[in-house]
Amino acid sequence: MDLAAAAEPGAGSQHPEVRDEVAEKCQKLFLDFLEEFQGSDGEIKYLQFAEELIRPERNTLVVSFADLEQFNQQLSTTIQEEFYRVYPYLCRALKTFVKDRKEIPFAKDFYVAFQDLPTRHKIRELTSSRIGLLTRISGQVVRTHPVHPELVSGTFLCLDCQTVIKDVEQQFKYTQPNICRNPVCANRKRFLLDTNKSRFVDFQKVRIQETQAELPRGSIPRSLEVILRAEAVESAQAGDRCDFTGALIVVPDVSKLSTPGARAETNSRVSGADGYETEGIRGLRALGVRDLSYRLVFLACHVAPTNPRFGGKELRDEEQTAESIKNQMTVKEWEKVFEMSQDKNLYHNLCTSLFPTIHGNDEVKRGVLLMLFGGVPKTTGEGTSLRGDINVCIVGDPSTAKSQFLKHVDEFSPRAVYTSGKASSAAGLTAAVVRDEESHEFVIEAGALMLADNGVCCIDEFDKMDMRDQVAIHEAMEQQTISITKAGVKATLNARTSILAAANPVSGHYDRSKSLKQNINLSAPIMSRFDLFFILVDECNEVTDYAIARRIVDLHSRIEESIDRVYSLDDIRRYLLFARQFKPKISKESEDFIVEQYKRLRQRDGSGVTKSSWRITVRQLESMIRLSESMARMHCCDEVQPKHVKEAFRLLNKSIIRVETPDVNLDQEEEIQMETDEGQGGVNGHADSPAPVNRFNGSSEDASQETVSKPSLRLGFAEYCRISNLIVLHLRKMEEEEDESALKRSELVNWYLKEIESEIDSEEELINKKTIIEKVVHRLTHYDHVLIELTQAGLKGSSEGSESYEEDPYLVVNPNYLLED
């Protein structure tokens, strides 16, 4: 790769070739380094790597800069300070080294790439003072261009004298010879490029951007174009956080040079008196000097993940095995991972270590932790992909630490993107099609979901997104792909990401009397794509409020002492990377248990008690499977055990069934009856006996008026479930003890009142409790169908007996009813 402005062979014999003595000395010393430097085993370290370069697809040798410093400090300093100048000579030294040992094609070029540079620079630190120096920079790839061939050294044919002019350097734009090399030919502009004899190399342009971690507060992230060549192409995808090793260079800004005004100026030259041009035609070069149309780009020779020891570019790396991950760790680090895997209290310790500054919300912590471990992605025989990533939505009142969860995950995960729903468009979340400034072709620019591929996408204010933007992520959440068909570009891109979303209730406060769907502004398809929903309600509780206040004050006053971590974040990252390599299988026992739990969820969904809960679908079954696999992964198990399924069911049950707990209206039937009476205009009322009027206060004593003003009797959902469970357990116990035992309604009421005898202090309270239990029994019988009144079939005795039977019927439990845990 001829990159430096190496001297061009002279145009004829009158121009001797200029030699660069410093670069030639570097070439000789670098060749000595390749031939003499030995590894820890005493063998020549780079000999085997160089022999692999004879394969057609290989042409780049990766050299450790630390080895170069160890071999010759002066050589390493010269290469670092004069990299762009000496780089072509280093490539020639490599070609000589390979040529001496193997037969290689004459026209094949070889390239050198450096890694393990001691210092890393930010994009913001790249100024003109670093032009030409060997530098390592880091950033996140946001746009990739397609790979195409680049002309690096052209062979031209003079159209006047047919002279062949070889090795004309191309300075990042199409460059013709200044003049024909034939001394008797004065041709300056009529040349033809011979593509068969010219040298081309693979060329790709990517755009990188500063990461959020290194961005100064309140600053807009800066971006830089990176040029990749040869083996470095296609080594970085949109969303990757990578280190690029190479040199900062100056190239002509072709996009500005190709504007209509610039093209017109290239043709306007000052002509002499005889019609000859007084200035030689130098094409765009002269214009570039005049207008200073140049820009900085980074020419990279090596690309590597920013943090390879923690999974590098992503949490999921399919090629890694447990053994390869172990080899990346030190002995002490591996012992720590092994110790964590044997921890009996690992589940709790990981939660507290990951979110040390958030008090309470243990269920949310567990759900987010399982999301980080993730399930096992699968592919069916027909090629259909089943996602393994877990999506979590946190819904809650303001100041319940929703955004803190998102921020913690964003900082912890090696590949996470944090965005706000209101400030994001559909293209910003998925992908945008933009026009390239130079080639004017359409290229794809990655959105948040693509940047978070194989990571976590944290979306705050999820409910504030426009409906059309919500629709854009339907496909990404379930199929984990993004399909684009616009501006002549048709592509299906990967978006294998877990989504952690935070949303506020519609009215600013979660209303327990309404369903989840009524509380948040999300469509049913989006809701069904979330595996876990967590509801955070800001309730007034003296004990909880004191604990939270104490925690916050401790954080402000003694931040170091108040943060108590069992494991450091680096320990958790290492353990997470190791545990994600496990692919647990579902055992037969666990399979039956999962089916049984899903049947319970479905039957409970259809019952009257939880009728307001959102629908339980097959997606919730898949959610249970993913959560079970995640639990097995966390404990480094190769098989999903029933205890893992039980915890997954508990979390799912917490987020689905307990999501809505409205108070139960025990006077519902009476209110409906009153509305019916009002609608009939008093037809069934007592018209013959008008209500007396109190003369002193002028108020009517009509019973119906009294009923209207009286508030309806309501019972908390948890209390209602407790009473119904007590009744069901008692009735079933009676059925088991005696074959023909059935309690009358009055006997059941008396039994309950006797059970709570210690809680009753007055006659008024006794009447109140009796009214409540009677209404609960009535609702369980006529609305929820938990209890069944025995019919009168076969008991047609005396009329007196039948009347008493209907007033006080026998009650039994519905055989299809499943008792809640």
Swiss-Prot record:
**Where are the N6-acetyllysine residues found in this chain?**
K643
The enzyme's E.C. designation: 3.6.4.12
- An individual GO BP term: premeiotic DNA replication
> What does the UniProt PTM comment say about this protein?
O-glycosylated (O-GlcNAcylated), in a cell cycle-dependent manner.
Provide the top EC class.
Answer: hydrolase
Q: Name the residues that bind ADP.
A: R619, E622
Quote the catalytic activity from the record: ATP + H2O = ADP + phosphate + H(+)
Query: What further fact does the record state?
Result: Early fractionation of eukaryotic MCM proteins yielded a variety of dimeric, trimeric and tetrameric complexes with unclear biological significance. Specifically a MCM467 subcomplex is shown to have in vitro helicase activity which is inhibited by the MCM2 subunit. The MCM2-7 hexamer is the proposed physiological active complex.
**GO MF terms, alphabetically ordered:** ATP binding; ATP hydrolysis activity; DNA helicase activity; identical protein binding; single-stranded DNA binding
Protein name, entry field: DNA replication licensing factor MCM6
What GO CC terms are in its UniProt record? CMG complex; cytosol; MCM complex; nucleus
Superkingdom as given in the UniProt entry? Eukaryota
Matching entries from Gene3D superfamilies are given as:
1.20.58.870, 2.20.28.10, mini-chromosome maintenance (MCM) complex, chain A, domain 1, Nucleic acid-binding proteins, P-loop containing nucleotide triphosphate hydrolases
